[in-house]
Amino acid sequence: FFTQEVVDAMIYAGDHHLDVVNMSFFADPWLFNCKNDADQRAIVTAISRASRYAQQRGVVMVAAQGNEAIDLAHPVTDEISPDFPPGSELTREVGNNCVVLPNELPGVVGVTGIGPSGELSFFSSYGAGVTDVTAPSGSSGQAPNPFGRVLAAWSSTGPPIDLPGRDVQDAGGAVYAWVQGTSMASPHAAGVAALIRAAHPSMSAGAVQATLQNTAMPKDCPTPAETDPLSGALGVQTCTGGPGHTNFYGKGLVDALAAGSG
């Protein structure tokens, strides 16, 4: 989704006082928007204002961390954008003046993904100060298919879909498919936030976020803290943080029972 569509959707959410919004996307065309670039700085400003507008009207904003296996607290390169027009991708250096939208915006709940083994999914991005909670996203290397993936709704309307390695039914209407990605994780967290809102309709957006995090099941860093899930293909991922909060898992795994009954 490009800037105008993202801004319009956030303003709509605020105007209609939606309870929870899930955002399983990054704002096209840039994975990282860098504030030293005038055009990208304008994108950051516009989407930040729209997000703040929605939050001020009680909307709980939840976002996927992304599937690039990047430490968002220490980004180095962006190799996948701009993603439009197709084929225009370039490799560029990025730093902490560059952010992924919308998940690095203030007040947005950032969600990483874990696989069936309970470990960080091999593709999940993460980062200190960015990761708030974690949720199931699938991770095909941790269990045989289809159990290494998540059964999720999938629209098959529009042009034919060809996704290597994914079981997608090419038929009219909505179907289900075994997929993986932090796009599967953030809806779990958004669903738990919705349970909190249902149990406490007058609770503020900030209080819902706090409850979501404080009722999560804590997850410590793995031993060893450095992992190399794809033997160098994605680089080494290093878990940092102490008991109760890490850059891999934030406050921990979302807990629907604890959150809904709290």
What are these regions (language model features)?
Residues F1-L105, D170-H188, A199-S202, P243-T246:
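Substrate-binding/access-modulating region of protease and related hydrolase catalytic domains
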Residues A46, P187-G191, A207, T211:
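Short amphipathic alpha-helical segments
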Residues V59, G87-A198, N247, V254-A258:
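Extracellular S/T/G-rich loop segment that most often corresponds to the catalytic His/Ser-adjacent loop
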Residues F26-P29, G113-P116, A216:
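Flexible loop residues that form catalytic
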Residues A69-F84, S140-L151, T157-P160, P218-D228:
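Internal, charge-rich low-complexity segments
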Residues W30, I70, S117-L120, P159, ...:
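Flexible, glycine-rich phosphate/dinucleotide-binding loops
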